[in-house]
Each structure stands twice: as C-alpha cells, then as structure tokens.
Amino acid sequence: MMHAIEKLPRRRENAIPWLLAALFAQPALAFQTELADGTQVVSTTNISYGAQWRADNALKPLIGPAYGGVSGSSANDDGNLNYSRGDLVSSVFKIVSDVELKKGQYGALVRAKAWYDSALENRSVPHGNSVNGYTPGRLSDRGFVNEARFSGVSLLDAYAYGNFRLDQSDLTVRVGKQVLNWGESTFFQGLNQTSPLDIPALRRPGAQIKEALIPVETAYFNWVPQNSPVSVEGFYEWKFRPFVVDGCGTYFSTSDIGVDNSCGASANLGPAITYPDGSIGYMQRGNNIRAKNSGQYGLAMHYNAEAIDTQFGLYAMNLHSGIPIFSAYTSSFVHGPAQLNALKYLFEYPENVRRYGATLATNLPGGWSLGMELSHSPNSPAQINAVDMFYAAVGSGLGPLGASYPFTTPDGTYMRGFNRVRQSQLLVNTLKLLSPMWGATGGTFIAEFAYQRAGIDDPGKAGAVRYGRGFNYGANIAAVCPSTVPGQCSNSGYATPSAYGYRLFGQLNYATDIGVSVKPSIYFAHDLKGWSVDGQLNEKRRTLGVSVRFERAAYWAEASYVGYNRNATYDDGRDRAFYGISVGYTF
C-alpha cells in the first residue's frame, strides 16, 4: 500500500500510508525448529525490491527564486530540484530478518535489516545537495546517520525477556532494544511516543512495521495480579534515540539544512537582510545539542471492567523530544560580514517533556470497537517560527522577537528555538472487521478523529510569538512582505490555539481460484481546521493513498499511489506525490 504516520519535523504527517501498508500487508510465515536442549528457534526473513517515481511537477512556491520559483527561501528546494515528474526516486533492495529463542519462561529476540537503494547510490541528479557541493551527478550521503544513508545494515530489536509467576501475580520483564506502543492512537501521536520513527525507512517501498519504529534500550515490566482487574506496566529508557529524518537532497526532504551536520547548507536570511557591503545575510551551521541518555521513564495502570467489556488506562511519562528543534546563535548585521562566524543555526532536542493521559477501549454492538485517548503535556516544546528567529538573530529589530534581541545583543548569544507550552489532545477512533461484501471475503475499516489544543496566542494578536510555518514563506506582515511570495503576507500557517482533523482507512480481501489473495485499500487524511504546534495538523492538507496487494503463499506484490492537496498553501510537501511497486518473498 502507500506509505506514511502523522509526524516529524513537519514531514512526519506523511508517514501514515507507509505504516498502514506495513501493518496490514506482511504474510506471517516463519521457520521453526527445536534444539536438542528443548530451545525453540523461530526465524522470519523478508526479501523485497521496490521502486518509486515522482507523480507530479514541482510547485513554484516551493522552489527558490534563483531557480525560477517564488519561494521565500532557497533552503528547502533541493529535493524538488533533483527530481522531475516521472523520475525514479527510489529503487531499493531490502532484507529484514529476526530470530527468536524460547525455552521455558525465558526468551530472546534479535532483529536486523539491510538495504541498498541503487537509485540514490548511482542515479545522477541535476542539482545535488550540500554534501556533494551542489554538483550535478550522484547524491552524497556522507555524514548522514546510518539509518538515513542510501545503503546500510542496522540492528533493530535485541532484547531478552522472562515470564514469572509470583505469589498470586504474573510478571513479564523485557530488557534491551525494544519497541513500546502505549495508548489507543492508530494514526495520530499522543501517548505512543516512547519509540521514535525512522522516516526514511517508512518511505522505502514495501516497508514493514518492524522497520518503522526505532527500538530503544529499555527495561520494561508488566505486572498482573491474579483475580484482579488491575495491571501495572512501566519502563525506563537508558539511551536517547531521536527521529531519523530524510537526508538533504532526497526526494521527500523539505529542508536543505538537514538535521545531520553534513547537511550544512547555509540558511538564506532573504533579501531583506543586507550587510553594509551589499552582501546577503546567511546563517552558518553550528553543532547540534543532543538530549542526555538518562531521565526517560513511564508508568501506566489498566483497569479491566469485564461487566461492561471496557478497559480503562492511566498513563504518566517523562521523555526527551525526538523531534529536532531549530535554534540559533546571534550576530548583529550592523557589525558586518566580519562577524558572520557568530551567526549560526543548530538543532536540539528538548529534555524532560512530561505527558499524562487516560484511555478507554470497548466493544460496541454490530462488531465495532471504540477507542478514546486524552493526553496532556504541561511543557511540550513548540518550535518558534524560524524566519522570525532569523530576523531577530541579526538584530534587525523586525518581527515579534526583534525587541528581545536588539542590535546591541552580544554576538554568539544563544537563541532557544522553542517555548514550553501546554498541549492537550483528544482522539476517538473506531475499527470494524467487515463482513463479506462486494464479492470480498471480508475487510477492515478504521476511522480516527483528533482535536488538539495548545496554550498559545492567536498568531494574529499583536506581539504574539508565532510558532511553526516553514521557511518557504519567507518573512511575514510584521517584518518584510514581498508580494511575490505566496502565503507570505498572511498570519495563516502559524500554529493556532486549536486544530482538528481525521483519518480513514479501508481494505477489502478477495480470494481467487488460483490461490492469489487480492487486497485493495484506500487511505484518506484531512486536516480540517487550524495548525497544531506539533505539526500533525495542517489546515487544508489532504492525503489520498490507494493500493492493491497480491499475495500467494510466501510471495507478494503491490502497486500504490499517494497524492496530496496541492492547494494546501502551508504544506511544504504538497507536491511530492508518488507511485510505486514492490515485490517480496517471506520465509
């Protein structure tokens, strides 16, 4: 199916089609044997090949003026400039394999993956990226984190577990690299933030859910008293692992100044900031600030009300944000180019984000299941608009931050790119396993609605700090406002106090006389109103994904298409539609 779960530095929202494909698509086949000492060995390996092509032309508002576009910045268009409609953007061979050992009440699991994208490794592109010096030819992934590279090997899960019978209770313990999934959310992120996302893995054709979630070094327990409706689970993570994002210059990247230090393209401040010698202002790359490894933990309690067939949950956790925040060091433009070395940008990961929540899961008449989740963070990091930061960082006095950083501010002053805000989210979802219909033997339908509220001012309020909105829209009505930049002369697109939207997914299963299962599916996402502080909701953004999958025994093949609403003005990825194919074998 398609590929994409709502979130990441402004592109995480396009991960959902991939995760749905991974979740509903993989045959459950495995090799099993038993050793002489009674140890059971279970292994599963999936070998696949997939390819993707660009389906739409690039939009001029997402390309810098130097290349014929009308964007407010030239720091976001490398992915667009490297690929035209119909171009091959990925051609990847993959192997994902896991082995589990079980004996009695103990066990261990190890999972790894390997991939080779021949298109990214060998195909010439016309523009390049900052890593290869913007030279036409092959892209370079030098300096990318391992998981974002064009080929590589990565260890995923690696943990040991034990199941223990205590005095009138059962205890399960797992220690090692593992994935946890808390809460009731299917598409949106709320309580399910214990495991970060590997975005490049999500985008690769034929992605499996095992590739999508990054295992974290964790000690986990689940305690279930006998004859009691209450259970308790908890975790402690001793290693910080951030999101993996698209490498600069690749098709899905919407920022040329990528999180990896190797993506060191200077951030153009725009023609409004000009030095005394007439040169244009730029920000150089600084060193990222990584979160500490310690201090991530959580506790949850569940109550199973059998009389009403409902489970309730209470959650509390303290995590470091895996989503990078853009921050800066100042340098007043009146000092001239000699002080440019002090003007820098960097990415950092805010620590100790507290989150609390309550959930409900129940079954309704007619075969429907219902899930609800209410989550709240009193100190969620919200990205301050980067363009407002640019103008303040050079002491221009422009924009809502200008007064806080006058031209007398010492060069090299740290400018934190986020504020801590209150953030609450309510989501409701439903799932139904479909009965035979339209010639199908059955199917699945899922719907989810989310409403988010944040403790921020309306962006149109005088003096309000503005959050979100990408580089492409340049300045704004409080600073410089060239009429050539669509969406610039407006307070739209900045994060709003409230936002809401929904997601739909449906799949039907057909059996044939030749033993081939055919599974057509459709995914639709619609962000109805507002822009959320975490980027999950972006007004007018719509995503449509359709696919058809064929399975016969251990073999499978799939064709898919994912498109976006090209009129969603403040969606930086609205022109990145694609279609793809993938084939695989599981043993």
State what each model feature region is.
Residues 31-43, 55-58, 99-108, 121, ...:
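Short loop/turn motifs that connect adjacent beta-strands in outer-membrane beta-barrel proteins
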Residues 49-55, 105, 114-118, 177-181, ...:
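Transmembrane beta-strands of outer-membrane beta-barrel pores
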Residues 42, 94-98, 157-159, 218-220, ...:
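Membrane-embedded beta-strand positions in outer-membrane beta-barrel channels/transporters
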Residues 59-80, 121-144, 198-204, 248-285, ...:
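Solvent-exposed loop segments that connect transmembrane elements
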Residues 41-49, 106-112, 171-173, 230-234, ...:
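Transmembrane beta-strands of outer-membrane beta-barrel proteins
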Residues 574-587:
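Outer-membrane beta-barrel "beta-signal"
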Residues 102-258, 319, 501, 529, ...:
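Outer membrane beta-barrel
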Residues 88-92, 304, 311, 316-324, ...:
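Detector for outer-membrane/organellar transmembrane beta-barrel domains
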